[in-house]
Amino acid sequence: MGKTVTLTAGHSNTDPGAVNGSDREADLAQDMRNIVAAILRDDYGLTVKTDGEGKGNMPLRDAVKLIRGSDVAIEFHTNAAANKTATGIEALSTPKNKRWCQVLGKAVAKKTGWKLRGEDGFKPDNAGQHSRLAYAQAGGIVFEPFFISNDTDLALFKTTKWGICRAIADAIAMELGATKV
């Protein structure tokens, strides 16, 4: 079928991103990348480029180079806020990826009941504290399916991680027109 998906994990072993107790954004992002990549490869036979395997990932300057030639490129993150009750799903990108952002957000919302932030899950990459995110400017999507700072959302993610990742992978495959192999 010739479709290529790029999946990357935000942050790294040297930059943990947001932290809640012993849970680090970098680790959760790597888990999401690894699970979604495995489902897309094993169940749909799609070509998946990643910025690493297991607990490794590339620096952002190298990860953005993977985007070229991809049908969709997604970098996994978690959201965080000082307000521990902040919740919701958002995907940040340029307007050309608005539909993809909404597809991803709706898949997670359907699985979890979490609300969609922005325009049905889409936010421009210069929204809020952000300003022209490098990954989005290179053609990718920065996907934040939940708030690591919200204890309830974090607990739900940890207990339903595989189901959430399955929903994301199935939505990607459906949007690309891929069928199970």
Region roles according to the model:
Residues 46-53, 115-122, 180-181:
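Surface-exposed patches in mature extracellular/periplasmic domains of secreted proteins
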Residues 34-45, 68, 105, 109-113, ...:
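Sec-exported extracytoplasmic/periplasmic mature domains
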Residues 2-89, 94-99:
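Catalytic-core regions of hydrolytic enzymes
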Residues 3-8, 15, 65-69, 73-79, ...:
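Active-site-adjacent mobile loop/cap segments within catalytic or ligand-binding domains
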Residues 97-123:
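Active-site-adjacent substrate-binding region
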Residues 26, 30, 98, 102, ...:
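Non-membrane alpha-helical structural segments and their capping/turn regions in soluble enzymes
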